[in-house]
Amino acid sequence: MAKEFGRPQRVAQEMQKEIALILQREIKDPRVGMMTTVSGVEMSRDLAYAKVFVTFLNDQDEAAVKNGIKALQEASGFIRSLLGKAMRLRIVPELTFFYDNSLVEGMRMSNLVTTVVKHDDERRVNPDDEKED
């Protein structure tokens, strides 16, 4: 019977914490900035590859996001070496960084719902406006 929370998930969870600390304390690249959040890590079953999902505080500008991801990808070797010192793994996984737009999409959906609710409340207050012929 397979475990619900296997080794790849446990390693990914610990790696997420360590990468967040490394980005906060060690990376000095201005393209990355101080406000980079590691929103998730997905590990391969053999623990050789890791997809790291990040978000940026200034993610309004698409060019800044692309530059941030590029900077992280260029620093992946350095991050990987620091990760190897922080975690005891036989193989330190190859890191690939991706922009996680789920936070932005969630905020967009929340704004849409708020707009619809506000419009619905206005229609309830003024029902005569809708039935004009």
From Swiss-Prot:
A cellular-component GO term for this protein: cytosol
GO biological process: maturation of SSU-rRNA
Cited Pfam families: RBFA
SUPFAM superfamilies xref list: Ribosome-binding factor A, RbfA
Entry keyword Cytoplasm: yes
Localization: Cytoplasm
Keyword terms, alphabetized: Cytoplasm, Ribosome biogenesis
Cytoplasm among keywords: yes
HAMAP family, sorted: RbfA
Free-text function comment from the UniProt entry: One of several proteins that assist in the late maturation steps of the functional core of the 30S ribosomal subunit. Associates with free 30S ribosomal subunits (but not with 30S subunits that are part of 70S ribosomes or polysomes). Required for efficient processing of 16S rRNA. May interact with the 5'-terminal helix region of 16S rRNA.
Subunit architecture: Monomer. Binds 30S ribosomal subunits, but not 50S ribosomal subunits or 70S ribosomes.
Sequence similarity: Belongs to the RbfA family.
UniProt protein name: Ribosome-binding factor A
Native source species: Enterobacter sp. (strain 638)
